[in-house]
Every structure is written in structure tokens, then in C-alpha cells.
């Protein structure tokens, strides 16, 4: 089975994705890492730098292209926080496997974003809309298209045991 994780920035897509992939012995694909490995250069070494250089539309096209070219075998895929706002990216994964929305209450997202900083895509979007509206739109979209909603407010992403427990809980949800 292929499992695709979506969620807001800081929801734990990468940390839980790695733990779950290890638990299930599946290959793990982090879309942000794949963007870097496919589009980095001497000038751009992070997905944030690539986003700034390419702009939103071209960056989104890159995400969709990568999703379309992933190997067909079962895997665990972690999407970017805004990936599913673009129809081409959704089309690339919609029949690929189980889409799981990692839900986190907004106050906790705000707290984490304040500590970690805003991703470039959010900074760009905030030129035309307030952050609360952007995040609410993303939540609504992910809830609408996700096969499963998995609350992760309680998960400590720096704790191996917490990630292992969340992995087991998510597997139980997927089997239900």
C-alpha cells in the first residue's frame, strides 16, 4: 500500500513519514527533498531557495512532475504543506494510495511556525491574504480530499517512542 501524508507546515509529515516508512519497511519520499535533489544547483541548495528562484507556479509544476515520475511500487510519500492546493499535484497522487491528512489545531501550528519560521510559499501567499485565511483554505482542501484524517497534536516529533506509537495508531486507522 502507498501512504501519502499531507498537512500544514510543521504538522510532522517528514518526521512521522520517516518513522512510519521504517516501521512498514517502505521506501520514503519527501517531496521537499526530491525538489532539492532534482532542481538544486550551485545557486539553489534548499527547497526555499528553489521556490524563491522559480516562483509559485513553476515550483508547483516541479512538484507535480516529481509526483508523476515516482516509482509505482508501494511507498510512503510526504507532500509539501501547499502541494495539494494545485490540481496537477492532486491528480498525480489521487489514485496512488491512501491520502492521510495529519491534522493539528491551528494554535499549535502558529506556535510552531513562530519558532521555525514561515516557509517561502506561505510568505508569498501572505502578500495577498492573511495567514489565517491561507491555512484555513489549506485545511478545508485537505479535509475535502483526504481518505483519512489523523490528529497529531499529541505527537512529540522529537521522540522516537512517540513517533512509533503514532505510526502504530495510524496503521490501525488505515486498517479500519
Curated annotation (Swiss-Prot):
Alphabetical GO biological process terms: amino acid biosynthetic process; aromatic amino acid family biosynthetic process; chorismate biosynthetic process
Biological pathway: Metabolic intermediate biosynthesis; chorismate biosynthesis; chorismate from D-erythrose 4-phosphate and phosphoenolpyruvate: step 5/7
Positions of Mg(2+) binding: 14
UniProt KW keywords: Amino-acid biosynthesis, Aromatic amino acid biosynthesis, ATP-binding, Cytoplasm, Kinase, Magnesium, Metal-binding, Nucleotide-binding, Transferase
UniProt cofactor(s): Mg(2+)
EC number: 2.7.1.71
Broad class of where this protein is predominantly found: cytoplasm
Superkingdom of the source species: Bacteria
GO molecular function: ATP binding; magnesium ion binding; shikimate kinase activity
HAMAP family cross-referenced by the UniProt entry: Shikimate_kinase
Name of the protein in question: Shikimate kinase
Lineage: Bacteria, Pseudomonadati, Chlamydiota, Chlamydiia, Chlamydiales
Amino acid at each position: 500500500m502507498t501512504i501519502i501524508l499531507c498537512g500544514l507546515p510543521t504538522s510532522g509529515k517528514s518526521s512521522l513519514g520517516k518513522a512510519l516508512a521504517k516501521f512498514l519497511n517502505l521506501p520514503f519520499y519527501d517531496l521537499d527533498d526530491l525538489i532539492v535533489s532534482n532542481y538544486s544547483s550551485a545557486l539553489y541548495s534548499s527547497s526555499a531557495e528553489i521556490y524563491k528562484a522559480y516562483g509559485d507556479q513553476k515550483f508547483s509544476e516541479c512538484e507535480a512532475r516529481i509526483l508523476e515520475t515516482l516509482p509505482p511500487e508501494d511507498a510512503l510519500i510526504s507532500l509539501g504543506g501547499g502541494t495539494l492546493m494545485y490540481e496537477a499535484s492532486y491528480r498525480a497522487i489521487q489514485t496512488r494510495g491512501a491520502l492521510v491528512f495529519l491534522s493539528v489545531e491551528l494554535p499549535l501550528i502558529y506556535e510552531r511556525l513562530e519558532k521555525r519560521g514561515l516557509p517561502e510559499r506561505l510568505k508569498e501567499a501572505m502578500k495577498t491574504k492573511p495567514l489565517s485565511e491561507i491555512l484555513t483554505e489549506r485545511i478545508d482542501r485537505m479535509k475535502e480530499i483526504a481518505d483519512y484524517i489523523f490528529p497529531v497534536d499529541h505527537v512529540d516529533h522529537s521522540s522516537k517512542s512517540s513517533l512509533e506509537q503514532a505510526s502504530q495508531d495510524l496503521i490501525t486507522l488505515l486498517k479500519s
